[in-house]
Swiss-Prot record:
GO terms for biological process: phosphate ion transmembrane transport. Keywords: Cell membrane, Membrane, Phosphate transport, Transmembrane, Transmembrane helix, Transport. InterPro entries: Phos_transporter. This is Putative phosphate permease TC_0064. The keyword Transmembrane helix applies. It comes from Chlamydia muridarum (strain MoPn / Nigg). It is a multi-pass membrane protein. The chain crosses the membrane at residues 1-21, 37-57, 83-103, 104-124, 140-160, 183-203, 207-227, 260-280, 309-329, 365-385, 399-419. Potential transporter for phosphate. One of its GO terms (cellular component) is plasma membrane. It is found in: Cell membrane. GO terms for molecular function: phosphate transmembrane transporter activity. Its main location: membrane.
Length: 426
């Protein structure tokens, strides 16, 4: 059945391409919406870190989706039905994401693939096939992720306003606090890497923790040095076209000189956040495309399945994410970055930091959560800190509706593809 494996691998790349086109907005949309990065710069940064996240941490979440929802055991589900079911789930996800991306809907790719996996399990009418406890845990994480993301974003932005923006001298306050913010970012990323087990493959935990602490100290010192060396606290006399300051000024004429300096420093911190978010997104969402491929390969060739094979599949998924965001990612980036609420670097920083911590932590513990839920929750948290009038409720309604539609749509498409495969090959 090598021909089926070839089709599945192509389908995995196709699905990863659509994931990159739809879900990349969660990683870089706030940076583009805040004017920190151009679309070209955002694609370049995301391409590098999405791929790294996919190949370094993606295998943990792959294990949850591949074998944690539907059992391929011989006495419960036949090998042929499992292969057909995973193939159906894969193509159902790709088709639905392509439809959503065409209309600019920021749907949850995790919803789509889990809906697809559950779809073929339900059509078999074998209740024992589906691990409902795993499904319940995943659904709870989906409900909790926007609440947690929004709560942290609200707290972070409220702190920024009180400790920096509302101060009599916001520039001095920003210069004092910026090193601590960068240190927290680096510590969070390092801690997530340690908890995920990825670093443990190379060095022992005590050594890894000491390295992280060293990087935190370096980030703190480098920020102090960088702010003064690059004169970030002083505005230049002339603003060149196409520069960061030019983009910030083009977004709003309400910036005073002091606030423009503050937002400029936040912009550089937000670039770090964009890298963190891209890494976290790649580590979590590559599983949505590669888990069915890995599951089918394991069912067809159990003797040759190995970590090396899984690494090849993860690399393929990472490349698919990169091509998707480079060719079609702008549609949903526009929705996330510009249509929900007005973002500035300080607001985008709050969204990015809270989202990155939530998503990467979930990936480290093997929970396939929805990055869309987390980011939208974080954007809502920042918006609510400014008042309900700052939020585009019509867009929020459309996004929430897409959350409810995606699971049944993925299941329905999966059932259709599953029955089609059975009719053709059985």
């Amino acid at each position: 059945m090598w021909w089926l494996l070839v089709c599945v691998v192509i389908g995995g790349f196709y699905t990863a391409w659509n994931i990159g086109a739809n879900d990349v907005a969660n990683a870089v949309g706030p940076s583009v919406g805040a004017g920190v990065l151009t679309l070209r710069q955002a694609v370049l940064i995301a391409a590098v870190f999405e791929f790294l996240g996919a190949v370094v941490l993606g295998d943990r979440v792959i294990g949850t989706i591949e074998s944690g929802l539907v059992a391929p055991a011989d006495h419960v589900l036949s090998s042929q039905d499992y292969v057909f079911g995973m193939t159906a789930a894969l193509f159902a996800t790709g088709v639905w994401l392509q439809i959503a991306s065409f209309f600019g809907w920021p749907v949850s790719t995790t919803h789509a693939i889990v809906g697809g996996v559950l779809g073929f399990g339900i059509i078999l009418k074998e209740d024992a096939v589906i691990y409902w406890d795993s499904c319940a845990r995943i659904f709870v994480s989906w409900l909790a992720s926007p609440i947690i993301g929004g709560y942290f974003a609200f707290l972070i932005f409220s702190f920024i306003r009180k400790a920096i923006l509302y101060k009599r001298d916001p520039v001095s306050a920003m210069v004092r606090i910026a090193p601590f913010l960068s240190a927290i970012i680096i510590f969070a990323l390092g801690l997530i890497l340690i908890l995920s087990g990825a670093v443990a493959r190379v060095v022992a935990f005590p050594v890894a923790f000491r390295v992280v602490c060293g990087l935190v100290v370096f980030a703190f010192a480098f920020t102090i040095w960088g702010v003064h060396f690059f004169k970030l606290a002083v505005l230049p006399q002339k603003v060149g076209p196409g520069t960061l300051l030019d983009r910030l000024l083009s977004k709003s004429t309400d910036y005073g000189r002091q606030y423009l300096v503050v937002e400029r420093i936040f912009a550089y911190l937000q670039i770090v956040i964009a890298c963190f978010m891209s890494f976290a997104h790649g580590s979590n969402d590559v599983a949505n495309a590669i888990a069915p491929v890995a599951g089918i390969y394991r069912a067809l060739y159990p003797q040759s399945y190995s970590p090396k094979v899984l690494f090849i599949f993860m690399s393929l998924g990472g490349l698919g994410l990169v091509f998707g965001l480079a060719t079609w990612g702008w549609r949903v980036i526009d929705t996330i970055g510009k249509k929900i609420t007005e973002l500035t670097p300080s607001r985008g920083f709050s969204v990015g930091m809270s989202s990155a911590i939530t998503i990467a932590a979930a990936s480290a513990f093997g929970f396939p959560i929805s990055t869309t839920h987390v980011v939208v929750g974080a954007v809502l948290g920042v918006g609510l800190a400014r008042g309900l009038q700052a939020i585009n409720l019509r867009i929020i309604k459309d996004i929430v509706l897409s959350w409810f539609v995606t699971v049944p749509a993925g299941a329905a498409l999966s059932i259709m593809f599953f029955l089609l495969l059975r009719a053709v090959f059985c």
